[in-house]
């Protein structure tokens, strides 16, 4: 069994950036988002995790730019879109742009009825991002708290959610290793698939996540580790597919 890897391209003010712990103002600029995405596709990526940080933080959006990335690369790679998807208009815009999957942030959990409806309507084209601090959800660009993790999961499981993207926000962009215990806790409580996000800093972290494959942790998002040169995507894919 192989682990699916999703290199991340986070977009703010039209540029590819990386944040530390999801904090606005902590970004490092990595240039053109299209060039970044193309780099990962050329290196063998089958998925890209494309994030509109301005939409997530409520400071505008990069919708046109994200649409252009999908237009140019969508025939070569599956694109998961994330950031600021919290109503029909933002969800429809992402799907109409050609996203293979759309990640609904915990901000959408402020409207659970809507979340349940779109899960029912779109099935596995919708994933729910669980951004976690301890066992509490962080919402709206990680600034606010959004409720208990496991209570929220019970509701989403009942609604038929097919995938969770689980991020320990204290580790994201910190190169401090993923929270394996959290990933295991989530995977053991649901039949949904789980994507690991945040903190991956070395190839051994991917090996540790791979051990959770039998529980349903089938994929991992790679961000700062790739941009900072901790390892190459080719090296990561070799581990993921071993």
From Swiss-Prot:
It is found in: Cytoplasm. Pathway: Amino-acid biosynthesis; L-histidine biosynthesis; L-histidine from 5-phospho-alpha-D-ribose 1-diphosphate: step 4/9. InterPro entries: Aldolase_TIM, His_biosynth, HisA/PriA_Actinobacteria, Isoase_HisA-like, Isoase_HisA-like_bact, RibuloseP-bd_barrel. It catalyses: 1-(5-phospho-beta-D-ribosyl)-5-[(5-phospho-beta-D-ribosylamino)methylideneamino]imidazole-4-carboxamide = 5-[(5-phospho-1-deoxy-D-ribulos-1-ylimino)methylamino]-1-(5-phospho-beta-D-ribosyl)imidazole-4-carboxamide. Its main location: cytoplasm. The active site is at 10 (proton acceptor), 131 (proton donor). One of its GO terms (molecular function) is phosphoribosylanthranilate isomerase activity. Belongs to the HisA/HisF family. GO terms for cellular component: cytoplasm. HAMAP family: HisA (MF_01014). The keyword Isomerase applies. This is 1-(5-phosphoribosyl)-5-[(5-phosphoribosylamino)methylideneamino] imidazole-4-carboxamide isomerase. The keyword Amino-acid biosynthesis applies. GO terms for biological process: L-histidine biosynthetic process; L-tryptophan biosynthetic process. It comes from Bifidobacterium animalis subsp. lactis (strain AD011). Keywords: Amino-acid biosynthesis, Cytoplasm, Histidine biosynthesis, Isomerase. Its EC number is 5.3.1.16. It holds the Pfam family His_biosynth.
């Amino acid at each position: 069994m192989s682990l699916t890897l999703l290199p991340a391209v986070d977009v703010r003010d039209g540029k590819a950036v990386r944040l530390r712990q999801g904090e606005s103002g902590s970004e490092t600029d990595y240039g053109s988002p299209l060039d970044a995405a193309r780099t990962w596709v050329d290196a063998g990526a089958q998925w890209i995790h494309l994030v509109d940080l301005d939409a997530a933080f409520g400071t505008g959006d990069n919708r046109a730019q994200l649409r252009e990335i999908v237009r140019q690369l969508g025939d070569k790679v599956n694109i998961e879109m994330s950031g600021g998807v919290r109503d029909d208009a933002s969800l429809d815009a992402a799907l109409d742009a050609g996203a293979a999957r759309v990640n609904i942030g915990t901000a959408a959990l402020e409207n659970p009825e809507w979340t349940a409806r779109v899960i029912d309507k779109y099935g596995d084209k919708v994933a729910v991002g669980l951004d976690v601090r301890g066992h509490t959800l962080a919402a709206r660009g990680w600034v606010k708290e959004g409720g208990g993790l496991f209570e929220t999961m019970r509701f989403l499981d009942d609604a038929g959610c097919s995938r969770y993207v689980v991020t320990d926000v204290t580790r994201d962009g910190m190169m401090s290793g993923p929270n394996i215990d959290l990933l295991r806790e989530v995977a053991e409580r649901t039949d949904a698939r789980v994507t690991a996000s945040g903190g991956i800093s070395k190839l051994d972290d991917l090996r540790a996540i791979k051990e959770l494959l039998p529980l349903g942790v089938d994929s991992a998002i790679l961000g700062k580790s790739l941009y900072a040169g901790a390892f190459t995507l080719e090296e990561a894919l070799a581990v993921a597919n071993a």
